[in-house]
Amino acid sequence: MSYKEEELKEFASQLAQCMENIDQFMVIYLIGNLGAGKTTFARGFLNFFGFDKVKSPTYSIVETYETENKIIHHFDCYRLTNPEELDLIGIRDYENQNCIHLIEWPEMAEGIVSSPDISIQIDGENDLRDINLNSGSFIGEKIFSCLDF
Protein backbone atom coordinates (compact mmCIF):
# COMPACT_ATOMS: atom_id res chain seq x y z
CA MET A 1 0.00 0.00 0.00
CA SER A 2 1.33 3.44 -0.90
CA TYR A 3 0.24 6.64 0.81
CA LYS A 4 0.86 10.37 0.62
CA GLU A 5 1.50 12.08 3.98
CA GLU A 6 -2.14 13.02 4.66
CA GLU A 7 -3.31 9.55 3.58
CA LEU A 8 -0.75 8.00 5.95
CA LYS A 9 -2.21 10.03 8.82
CA GLU A 10 -5.74 9.01 7.78
CA PHE A 11 -4.72 5.34 7.77
CA ALA A 12 -3.16 5.77 11.21
CA SER A 13 -6.40 7.34 12.42
CA GLN A 14 -8.37 4.38 11.06
CA LEU A 15 -6.05 2.00 12.93
CA ALA A 16 -6.59 4.00 16.13
CA GLN A 17 -10.35 3.78 15.65
CA CYS A 18 -10.07 -0.01 15.35
CA MET A 19 -8.14 -0.10 18.64
CA GLU A 20 -10.25 2.39 20.57
CA ASN A 21 -12.58 -0.11 22.26
CA ILE A 22 -10.12 -2.95 22.89
CA ASP A 23 -9.54 -3.16 26.63
CA GLN A 24 -6.05 -4.60 26.85
CA PHE A 25 -2.39 -3.65 26.57
CA MET A 26 -1.33 -3.35 22.91
CA VAL A 27 1.98 -2.67 21.20
CA ILE A 28 2.63 -1.20 17.75
CA TYR A 29 6.12 -1.18 16.29
CA LEU A 30 6.85 1.64 13.83
CA ILE A 31 9.80 0.61 11.68
CA GLY A 32 11.58 2.62 8.99
CA ASN A 33 14.56 4.78 8.15
CA LEU A 34 15.00 8.37 9.30
CA GLY A 35 12.34 10.52 7.67
CA ALA A 36 10.24 7.55 6.56
CA GLY A 37 7.10 8.78 8.33
CA LYS A 38 7.05 7.00 11.70
CA THR A 39 6.31 10.16 13.67
CA THR A 40 3.81 11.30 11.02
CA PHE A 41 2.02 7.98 11.49
CA ALA A 42 2.05 8.45 15.28
CA ARG A 43 0.60 11.96 14.85
CA GLY A 44 -2.27 10.62 12.75
CA PHE A 45 -2.89 7.89 15.32
CA LEU A 46 -2.94 10.38 18.21
CA ASN A 47 -5.02 12.91 16.25
CA PHE A 48 -7.85 10.36 16.28
CA PHE A 49 -7.84 10.48 20.08
CA GLY A 50 -8.10 14.29 20.02
CA PHE A 51 -4.45 15.28 20.35
CA ASP A 52 -3.66 18.00 17.84
CA LYS A 53 -0.22 18.87 19.17
CA VAL A 54 1.99 15.80 19.01
CA LYS A 55 5.71 16.19 19.44
CA SER A 56 8.38 13.67 18.64
CA PRO A 57 9.75 11.94 21.75
CA THR A 58 13.25 11.79 20.24
CA TYR A 59 14.82 13.61 23.19
CA SER A 60 12.40 12.68 25.97
CA ILE A 61 12.24 9.00 24.84
CA VAL A 62 8.56 8.81 25.80
CA GLU A 63 5.55 11.13 25.56
CA THR A 64 2.30 10.12 27.25
CA TYR A 65 -1.21 11.00 26.08
CA GLU A 66 -4.29 10.23 28.19
CA THR A 67 -7.94 10.11 27.23
CA GLU A 68 -10.90 9.12 29.34
CA ASN A 69 -10.41 5.41 28.57
CA LYS A 70 -6.97 5.07 26.92
CA ILE A 71 -3.36 5.85 27.72
CA ILE A 72 -1.00 6.03 24.77
CA HIS A 73 2.75 6.03 25.29
CA HIS A 74 4.75 7.13 22.25
CA PHE A 75 8.35 5.88 22.52
CA ASP A 76 11.25 6.86 20.29
CA CYS A 77 14.19 4.53 20.93
CA TYR A 78 16.50 6.06 18.32
CA ARG A 79 18.81 7.74 20.84
CA LEU A 80 19.19 4.76 23.16
CA THR A 81 22.77 3.63 23.56
CA ASN A 82 21.68 0.57 25.53
CA PRO A 83 18.20 -1.04 25.56
CA GLU A 84 18.37 -1.25 29.35
CA GLU A 85 17.95 2.53 29.48
CA LEU A 86 14.23 1.79 29.11
CA ASP A 87 14.35 -0.26 32.30
CA LEU A 88 15.86 2.76 34.03
CA ILE A 89 12.87 4.91 33.06
CA GLY A 90 10.52 2.14 34.25
CA ILE A 91 9.08 0.88 30.97
CA ARG A 92 7.27 -1.98 32.75
CA ASP A 93 5.32 0.63 34.74
CA TYR A 94 3.91 1.88 31.44
CA GLU A 95 2.31 -1.50 30.62
CA ASN A 96 -1.30 -1.39 31.77
CA GLN A 97 -4.71 -2.48 30.54
CA ASN A 98 -6.25 0.06 28.14
CA CYS A 99 -2.75 1.18 27.23
CA ILE A 100 -1.16 1.38 23.78
CA HIS A 101 2.56 1.63 23.09
CA LEU A 102 3.63 3.22 19.81
CA ILE A 103 7.32 2.35 19.54
CA GLU A 104 9.61 3.97 16.98
CA TRP A 105 12.96 2.23 16.42
CA PRO A 106 11.99 -0.92 18.39
CA GLU A 107 15.15 -2.66 17.16
CA MET A 108 17.13 -0.30 19.42
CA ALA A 109 15.29 -1.73 22.44
CA GLU A 110 15.29 -5.40 21.51
CA GLY A 111 14.74 -7.68 24.47
CA ILE A 112 13.26 -4.89 26.60
CA VAL A 113 10.10 -3.77 24.82
CA SER A 114 7.11 -6.10 24.62
CA SER A 115 6.45 -8.08 21.45
CA PRO A 116 4.25 -6.26 18.95
CA ASP A 117 0.62 -6.90 18.25
CA ILE A 118 1.21 -5.01 15.01
CA SER A 119 4.42 -4.12 13.17
CA ILE A 120 4.27 -1.34 10.62
CA GLN A 121 7.15 -0.99 8.17
CA ILE A 122 7.21 2.43 6.49
CA ASP A 123 9.45 2.95 3.47
CA GLY A 124 9.85 5.65 0.88
CA GLU A 125 10.77 9.26 0.50
CA ASN A 126 9.47 12.37 -1.18
CA ASP A 127 5.69 12.15 -1.60
CA LEU A 128 4.84 8.44 -1.24
CA ARG A 129 5.22 5.99 1.63
CA ASP A 130 4.91 2.24 1.26
CA ILE A 131 3.35 0.50 4.24
CA ASN A 132 3.71 -3.16 5.16
CA LEU A 133 1.71 -4.52 8.08
CA ASN A 134 2.39 -7.65 10.09
CA SER A 135 0.38 -9.11 12.92
CA GLY A 136 2.20 -10.52 15.91
CA SER A 137 -0.80 -11.71 17.92
CA PHE A 138 -4.44 -12.71 17.90
CA ILE A 139 -5.39 -9.17 18.86
CA GLY A 140 -3.34 -7.87 15.90
CA GLU A 141 -5.36 -10.12 13.59
CA LYS A 142 -8.58 -8.84 15.15
CA ILE A 143 -7.49 -5.25 14.52
CA PHE A 144 -6.55 -6.07 10.90
CA SER A 145 -10.04 -7.45 10.29
CA CYS A 146 -11.43 -4.02 11.21
CA LEU A 147 -9.21 -2.10 8.78
CA ASP A 148 -10.50 -0.99 5.41
CA PHE A 149 -7.57 -1.58 3.04
Enumerate the predicted regions with their spans.
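N-terminal pre-Walker A segment at the start of P-loop NTPase domains
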Residues: M1-C18
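Phosphate-binding P-loop
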Residues: C18-F25
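Short hydrophobic/aromatic beta-strand immediately N-terminal to the Walker A/P-loop
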Residues: V27-Y29
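P-loop (Walker A) phosphate-binding loop of NTP-binding proteins
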Residues: I31-N33
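Conserved lysine of the Walker
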Residues: K38
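Short beta-strand-centered segment that lines the nucleotide-binding/catalytic pocket of NTP-utilizing
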Residues: F51-E66
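Short phosphate-coordinating micro-motif centered on Lys-Gly-acidic
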Residues: T81-E84, R92-F149
